Structure formats: C-alpha cells, structure tokens
Amino acid sequence: MSIDREKLKRSIRLFLEAIGEDPDREGLKETPDRIVRLWEEFKSYENFNMTVFEDIGDYNEMVVVRDIQFYSFCEHHLLPFFGKAHIAYIPEKKVCGLSKLVRVVNKFAYRPQVQERLTAQIAEFLEKELSPKGVAVVLEAEHLCMSMRGVKNPTSYTITSKLTGAFMEDEKTRNEFLNLIHNGR
C-alpha cells in the first residue's frame, strides 16, 4: 500500500496545530514533507524479495549474524524503539546472502509495530523462505515509550526471542547460539 502524501502532510500540520505549534514557523515548515519522506523510505522495504541460493554444498552448520541495528515505531505511542537483532539459522538446502538478513529485519521493523510481533515475523519469514533446520531470533531494544514517558526508565531493555526447529528442540544448539551472540565478542 502506498502512502497518501497529501493526507499525511495535512495530518502532520493538524497535529502540530493541535499541540499548540505553528506549522508555518521556521523549523517546522518542512516537517510534513520530512515525515512523508521518512515513511516512504520505510514503506520501500515492504516489497523486498529474498534471494535464496540452493547450491550450498555440504554446509549444514549454524549461520549467525548478530548486532543488526534496527529502528521501529511502537504502535501504541508512535515513539521509536531501537536496538539490535541477532539471527541464526541452520541450512537444510538453502542459504541467503548475509545482507538479506538485515533487509528482513528492516522489512518488518519499518512500520508501527510491537517487538514481540517483530521477532516472530522475522523468524516466520526465514522459516518460509529458507526451510532451514531451525531459526533463532533475539531482539534487544530500548523503547522510548518507556524511557521518555510513563515509567521514564531509560536504562531498561526489552529482550524477545523466537526459536524454531533445532534451536527449540536441542538445548546444545540453543546454547551454542546464545553463547555466540553474548560471549563471542
């Protein structure tokens, strides 16, 4: 779905007026256009298609990409949450380019979202596209809706995980993944 640029610009102007700001003052004049460009950039990731390689030889060990920086917006307050994603999978017959894992995170992060759903969507997408022996996704994030408002606790991080296949069923595999993302620095 594309963005209704004019409707979004009008809405941002109305929002600024509603909170007592002058949308025509210096510093805010271009804000509606900036917001439109931000959301157009975010929406551009929705159409990402995963490139998959099926000739992987005999490789059947864990593939891990950790510390993938991500940004999203809490769907309850429209405030940012951001942090790091750690992703692993064990190939069955398919692999993807490592940068594609970053794009998968962005595909689901760049929208109003909750961290729990984001974690599950990443894992489910990789399961569907790669048919691996297992997928592990851990997200660590600071939520500005907790840091700036409400409890005002800027030192807390939310950690969510989604494990499938070998990562869920085999404690040794799960522990190897957790060790790699926490101690392998």
UniProtKB/Swiss-Prot annotation:
Gene3D superfamilies: 1.10.286.10, 3.30.1130.10. Zn(2+) binds at residues 74, 77, 145. One of its GO terms (cellular component) is cytoplasm. The keyword Isomerase does not apply. InterPro entries: GTP-CH-I_C/QueF, GTP-CH-I_N, GTP_CycHdrlase_I, GTP_CycHdrlase_I_CS, GTP_CycHdrlase_I_dom. GO terms for biological process: one-carbon metabolic process; tetrahydrobiopterin biosynthetic process; tetrahydrofolate biosynthetic process. Its EC number is 3.5.4.16. Pathway: Cofactor biosynthesis; 7,8-dihydroneopterin triphosphate biosynthesis; 7,8-dihydroneopterin triphosphate from GTP: step 1/1. Keywords: GTP-binding, Hydrolase, Metal-binding, Nucleotide-binding, One-carbon metabolism, Zinc. Signal peptide: none annotated. It is an enzyme of class 3 (hydrolase). It catalyses: GTP + H2O = 7,8-dihydroneopterin 3'-triphosphate + formate + H(+). GO terms for molecular function: GTP binding; GTP cyclohydrolase I activity; zinc ion binding. HAMAP family: FolE. NCBIfam families: folE (TIGR00063), PRK09347.1-2 (NF006825), PRK09347.1-3 (NF006826). Belongs to the GTP cyclohydrolase I family. Homomer. This is GTP cyclohydrolase 1. It comes from Persephonella marina (strain DSM 14350 / EX-H1). The gene is folE.
